Amino acid sequence: MRQRSNTFFLLFAIVTAMSLVTAAVAMAATIIGDNGPNNLTGTDQRDRIFARGGDDTINALARADRVIAGQGNDTVNAGAGHDDVSGGDGNDALDGGRGHDRVLGGEGDDAMEGGGGFPGRRGDELHGNAGNDNIEGGGGYDLITGNAGLDTLNGGGGCDRIFAGPDNDTLNGGAGNNFRRLRCERLHGGAGNDTSTGGVGRDFMSGGFDNDTQSGGNGSDKIFANQGRDVSDGGNGRDVLWALSRKDVTAIGDLEGDELSGGEGNDRFLVRDGEKDLIHCGGGNDRVIADQYDQVDPDCERVEIRTITSLDQVQDDEENRTEAPSEDQDEGPTP
């Protein structure tokens, strides 16, 4: 009996020791670099990695990690999981990996990727900072914002919300195409001269505060020419092109306005903004509501000219609103 009891206690001690070792291995790590160039690798748990200064390479591996790259030209691969990545100052390359990640660029020219997302699900948040950033969304529903600098913002494969910054940015909707949603890609210009291209599906596009160029591409798009002299092209599909009244208008018929092209498809134009707009209908059976200051191409099938006699008539009419309606209007950066 004594020998059997000793054997039991010995086995209990071994199992307990193994459990403690396993628990220690499973614990998340806090990894801290120094001010030199570091090569830091996380564990398969929820790690916190602080690289500090220097040109660092960081591989966070799996799970939901928090990575702060610090100053320097850093390369971060966050790996699978719902990660929180901050680039810091310097020209960084930041990849969120698979999962819905939050990636923040710092000052510098950053290249940021959301990584492989989950189609039809919540995607990544990718936010640029000062510098000329190149931001690429993933496969989910991403939120992408530019900031100061000449940014290129690409939506990727999901239905995305993209907001330009205060400078001259390029926005691309990507391959998102979900016909169950009224508008898949939503592209919003900022305070600069932005160039926006819609995706393959139904897009919502709004120019910003300067002279913007917008192209809807394939799909039935809704395009708003906002403040400034914008050029809007609906492309293929049944598009709605809207010329909004500019806030700097002091007299009707006094400003050169927007240029709107419908492209192929049965398009609709709403252009009663009191400016001298150009309207090109293109193929299809199109409808135009314009004012007496607009130049409408003769190929437009159904044209209704509504006379405007005062600036108050322009600004008070719901059709001539001075900003685009959108469920996203409170989510983007304020110019």
Describe each PLM feature range.
Residues 312-335:
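Ser/Thr/Gly/Pro-rich low-complexity, disordered linker/stalk segments of secreted
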Residues 31-33, 311:
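Disulfide-bonded cysteine-rich modules in secreted/extracellular proteins
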Residues 24-30:
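Sec/Tat signal peptide C-region and signal peptidase I cleavage site
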Residues 37, 46, 55, 64, ...:
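Consensus positions within tandem repeat domains that build extended binding/scaffold surfaces
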Residues 11-21:
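Bacterial N-terminal signal peptides
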Residues 2-12:
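Bacterial N-terminal signal peptides that target proteins for export
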Residues 33, 42, 51-53, 60, ...:
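Glycine-centered beta-turn/loop sites at beta-strand termini
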Residues 270-310:
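Leucine-rich solenoid repeat scaffolds
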